[in-house]
Structure formats: structure tokens, C-alpha cells
């Protein structure tokens, strides 16, 4: 297609006599307090390609994230033996959780990176003994699953990343995952 027709909307907003922004101690991200208008792309519809949604519902975000990470959590069968050793003699789920948690905490160092998706395999995280927030928490979730303990990763936004606005279901509001 050599030509695409489109509709362009131009808007202009002006704010007058806006007081200066003053940073306060213990404040979360300054972008949460500065007056602004945010725009999010809802969808695109190009000729011969249908409509692509970018903004859906919270359920869509949850489903999409769990589809991506589900394989990572359920996979990693190389962890099975290690988990069996860590949980040997542990009767309750709480004891299994504690054993696995302390193993991960004691053996995997945080590399300083805050991520919501792992960039390395869990095998590499174990070998290197370090990982991002996502890698450490997904490793924990994967090991818990191997011990037959349900693990639910949760997307969150750190204080510097800003508040999550419930009215705007977009995954860019989150910057890390915890388990």
C-alpha cells in the first residue's frame, strides 16, 4: 500500500500561573505530582491488517503477562532435583516456602536491575548466582511450583516509577514483579 488515509486531531492545552514544582522529602516519583495530560495509544487500524489493540483491560494485561511468564515458571525442569533436596522432610507448604525462599535469598544476588521480564534463563541465573528483580522472583516462583506450592507473580510499580492509575490499564505502569 503506497497511501494511507488518516484523521489527525490536534489539540492544544495551556496552563497559566502554574506554581513551581517543589520536591518534598520521601516523595514518590515527581511525575505523580506534576500537572500533565497523558495519552495512551488505544488501537491502530491499518488497511489490510485489521485492528490491533494496545489498551485493553486489567484482565487482558494479567492474561498476557502470565502467558509470557507461565512457560518460564512451569518449565525449568532442571530445578526439580534441587527443589526435592531443599524440601526433603518438609511437610507443610510453609516449610517448603521458607526453605526455597532462604535458598534463593542466600544464593542469588540482585544485579541492581529492576525488570518485569527476565532477560536471562533461570539456568543462567543459577549459574551466575545473580539476576534482576524479575529473574530472582521468577526463579522463586518456578522453584515453588516444582515443590507443588502455587506461586502468583504480581506486577508492581516501584516508588520511583510512580503510581498505578487504575483507570488506565496499560502494562507500562509497572516496572517489576514480585512473588
Feature locations, PLM:
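Active-site-proximal cofactor/substrate-binding loop regions of enzyme domains
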Residues: 95, 99, 117, 126, ...
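Short, flexible loop/turn elements at secondary-structure junctions
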Residues: 17, 129-130, 155-158
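Short, conserved helix/loop micro-motifs enriched in His/Cys and acidic residues
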Residues: 111-131
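Secondary-structure capping and boundary motifs in well-ordered enzyme cores
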Residues: 92-96, 125-136, 170-171
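Short acidic (Asp/Glu) and glycine-rich catalytic loops that position anionic groups and cofactors
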Residues: 76-82, 117-121, 159-161
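Hydrophobic/aromatic-rich core segments of domains that either
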Residues: 136-179
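Secretory-pathway-linked proteins and extracytosolic
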Residues: 1-112
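Contiguous, well-ordered alpha-helical segments that form the cores/surfaces of helical PPI scaffolds
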Residues: 101-105, 124-127, 137-142
